[in-house]
């Protein structure tokens, strides 16, 4: 599930993870080992290809900052904390780990996240993002990215 903190983005818009940061991890210790980083970046070439694909598909998107954490950002206070700590455009739970492992193993990678709701949407009220409907769009995005590599 993704929670967006950028008010210019709306449900079904996409954030390409140019920079992805752990939200609730102390990076002082982790950053002492390869890849010696406190944040992680999607591969520049993959970002370029994905951006072209999304533009061609007329999907609103940005290449921005994504924060990955182990909790839902579901209140204005949590949104403010996340923005202050990370300047994130979106919040989710897996992207930093994916890019961290990829960077550690020298593998180019890309994090692509669709907005499912606003960061201040209560979890119980979360219903405007239809995952089954968006799965078709996600598959088309993935296939088009692969075709353009």
Q: Where in the sequence are the language-model features?
A:
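A C-terminal functional module that forms or caps the active site or interfaces directly
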Residues: 72-124
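Mid-sequence, gly/pro-rich, charge-dense loop/helix-turn segments that line enzyme active sites
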Residues: 4-86
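Generic structural signal for well-ordered, non-membrane alpha-helical segments
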Residues: 39-47, 75, 91, 95, ...
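Short C-terminal domain-edge/linker segments immediately following a structured domain
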Residues: 26-32, 44-50, 95-98, 122, ...
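Short, hinge-like loop/turn segments at secondary-structure boundaries
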Residues: 13-16, 109, 128-130
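A structural motif corresponding to the C-terminal end of an alpha-helix
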Residues: 53-61, 101-107, 141-148
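His/Asp/Glu-rich mid-to-C-terminal helical/loop segments that flank catalytic regions of hydrolases
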Residues: 119-149
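Active-site loops and adjacent core secondary-structure elements that bind or stabilize anionic groups
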Residues: 1
